[in-house]
């Protein structure tokens, strides 16, 4: 899509595209190597602690193959019962595959899951999977038919439980 948008579709072959994608990822990995627990988004540590204390199962459904590395760098791995491997699913977001894999990883029916996303493709994937989406961002970017918070600091166990209750009506 990026090549088409830039008017370069068909100018770069599959091998060159793969090489450039790998180079981009290598640069990204170098950049994220400096990440520490201080880089955890506001409210996320408290949310993970509250979810864990309440006995909730937590899984990561990231399209990034760097997800496990980032969790480790931020000291968050201990909270996750499963980390879905984006390389092991047939289709990426907006297909539901990664969310279905995450739910399976923690042994939970996807219909009993709530997914938190900051991108439209992720929200679409959560819906397609049959889980309940909660967006982080703006309604004009994520859709106006889901619960949305402006920032991660607003994500609390109480808020998520209320969103779940409202959706079950």
Where on the chain are the PLM-derived regions?
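Helix-loop "lid/cap" segments that line or gate small-molecule binding pockets
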Residues: 1-12, 70, 103
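A generic structural signal for secondary-structure junctions
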Residues: 3-7, 33, 75-76, 153
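Metal-dependent phosphoesterase signature
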Residues: 5-42
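Non-catalytic, surface-exposed connector residues within folded enzymatic/regulatory domains
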Residues: 11-14, 38, 61, 74, ...
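Short beta-strands and strand-loop turn motifs
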Residues: 28-29, 61-62, 117
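Short, acidic loop-to-helix structural element flanking the phosphoryl-transfer center
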Residues: 30-60
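Asp-based, Mg2+/Mn2+-dependent phosphohydrolase catalytic module
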Residues: 45-56, 64-169
């Amino acid at each position: 899509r990026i090549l088409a948008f830039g008017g370069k579709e068909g100018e770069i072959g599959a091998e060159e595209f793969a090489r450039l994608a790998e180079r981009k990822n290598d640069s990204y990995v170098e950049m994220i190597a400096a990440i520490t627990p201080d880089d955890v988004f506001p409210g996320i540590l408290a949310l993970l602690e509250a979810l864990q204390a309440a006995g909730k199962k937590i899984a990561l459904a990231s399209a990034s193959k760097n997800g496990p590395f980032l969790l480790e760098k931020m000291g968050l791995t201990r909270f996750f019962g499963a980390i879905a491997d984006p390389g092991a699913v047939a289709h990426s977001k907006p297909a539901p595959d990664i969310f279905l894999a995450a739910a399976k990883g923690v042994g939970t029916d996807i219909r009993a899951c709530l997914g938190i996303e900051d991108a439209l493709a992720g929200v679409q994937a959560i819906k397609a999977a049959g889980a309940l989406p909660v967006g982080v961002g703006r309604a004009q970017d994520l859709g106006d038919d889901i619960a949305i918070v402006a920032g991660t600091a607003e994500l609390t166990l109480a808020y998520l439980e209320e969103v779940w209750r409202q959706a079950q009506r």
